[in-house]
Amino acid sequence: MKTGTKTATANEAASVTAGSGMKWVGRAIRRLEDPALVRGRGRFTADLPATHHVRFVRSPVAAGRLVRISAPDGVRLIRAADLAARPIRPMLHKFNYRPIEQPILAHDVVRFVGEPIAAVFASTAAQAEDAADHVEIEFAELPAVRDTGDALSPDAPTVHELGNTIVDARFTTSEFERTFGAAGRRVRLSVQSHRQNATPLETRAAHAAFDCASGRITLTCTTQMPHLTRTAIADILGFAESDLRVVAPDVGGGFGQKMSLAAEYIVLVFLARRLQDSVAWVEDRRENLIAGFHSRDQRLELEGAFDADGRIVALSADVLANVGAYSCFPTTCGVEPLMAMAELPGPYDLRAYSCRARAIATHTCTMAPYR
């Protein structure tokens, strides 16, 4: 600690208000969450007991038509046809956004490996996992596109009927054409940012409990946006927002992966209402790797224009973002390419800038924000 600074205690930190005259700047504030966590007293979603445990049956193929789903007698199964729910519909009212819908559970077709098709529930997590292994799904496999190059080829299969280009944004400053054309030197560069998974220490998890007295549901889940989660789920399932409470307890890492609405959470709330009981789901590591939201996977074609002293004076960019099969809620699939467009000039005094940024759908896991 630097000489002259003062470390604020928890009580002092709580007393810093707009009218108190105290300021945050120049004060070393102690972390308030550490004592409970280092003593093993954290409160995590997976710690909550439940009557029923859920396991999702996921697609083993990237693209295919669902022909048949069957399960042995005694396996309690929820399919898309059983859900009284609207699809997830993120909206963006600019940048040539094409609205695409994500079903809560896949019906008719699957669009990426790991897409949830059905939900099995049982008395224990182990029983649910065993039961899910006995669910049989027959597919008619379809051609798949795995990257932006495949998706933009003239004869490419379309992930959605609207086409594979979901966002097409363009930005050019007024000085660009003149400055770029007059520059004496140019350098071209191709850059690829590979696909990533946040791999948080705690995977995604949800616990939904029905209160028989009030008819309300409490959803405890590993979300970074409890308020938007409540609004979206109530809207999708068609009941009053006041009938749903969403709690975000201690979360073992979010990094943006837990900032988007998970279809699995909607299934948990639906089941809690139908069973009028408590249900729980904890994602395993394999599920998280294949079906937890991914990030990055961008290709950038850059051309910089320089003056005689080697100073960059103009930049041209073409950004292609592989955004996967669906558009994440609430930020939409435009978040990655549009952030790249906004941040590419970086700290440079660069007033001549032109960029095209596209979000391209493929038969891969959906992209979401990542720090």
Residue ranges of each PLM-predicted region?
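Alpha-helical support elements that line or immediately flank enzyme active sites
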Residues: 56-83, 117-138, 206-275, 332-343, ...
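Short acidic, glycine/serine/threonine-rich loops at helix termini
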Residues: 87-93, 131-134, 230-232, 255-261, ...
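Flexible, low-hydrophobicity surface segments
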Residues: 2-165
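Glycine-rich and small/hydrophobic secondary-structure elements
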Residues: 97-127, 257-308, 367-371
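Short coil/turn connectors at secondary-structure junctions
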Residues: 50-53, 73-75, 107, 114-117, ...
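Acidic, glycine-rich active-site loops and adjacent beta-strand->loop/helix elements
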Residues: 83, 223-226, 250-254, 283-293, ...
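Glycine-rich loop/linker segments at domain edges
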Residues: 33-35, 94-96, 100, 165-206, ...
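Beta-strand segments within the central parallel beta-sheet cores of soluble alpha/beta enzyme folds
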Residues: 80, 243-249, 276-286, 313-318, ...
